[in-house]
């Protein structure tokens, strides 16, 4: 079973308060999501391998460490996942960015893939799937399916707020995928929204309804 990591860092929790607040405007909401994604990236990349290299400082020669050639790919689920990309790219500018677009079939209520664009070297990369909200878990599970069908081997899921129901779905369908969240909320309501949640992340990021 994949592990669930819930970040309790004070800076993250402070910023999530304002992400949740319905009075936070689009500009501030967008900046806060960006900042939380950056903070979460520190933890989600903790297991990146390092190797020694020789450099010369202004004072002397030194042996120091760099990331050992690990190739990373960021996969935002359209459209809300886009809000998390830049915050991570600030720390990992060499990461490639793919996209997965899904819509919900009105009859079956199941997610349907309508767009996928990935780096060409899928099998060589570790991927981080990005979505601010993990609600029912259907979209995240289908996005992970899309990656696996195209050869991805190492996948993590990174969300800002998650419902227990969504976590359960992803863990059952993808027991090899670890989930990283900034907050684990109480439940889903009858409309499929996370409670207390943060509303519709896509609308709040892009100022739409």
Curated annotation (Swiss-Prot):
One of its GO terms (molecular function) is magnesium ion binding. InterPro entries: PRibTrfase_dom, PRTase-like, Upp_B, UPRTase/APRTase, Ura_phspho_trans. Binds 1 Mg(2+) ion per subunit. The magnesium is bound as Mg-PRPP. Catalyzes the conversion of uracil and 5-phospho-alpha-D-ribose 1-diphosphate (PRPP) to UMP and diphosphate. It comes from Bacillus thuringiensis (strain Al Hakam). It is an enzyme of class 2 (transferase). Pathway: Pyrimidine metabolism; UMP biosynthesis via salvage pathway; UMP from uracil: step 1/1. Belongs to the UPRTase family. This is Uracil phosphoribosyltransferase.
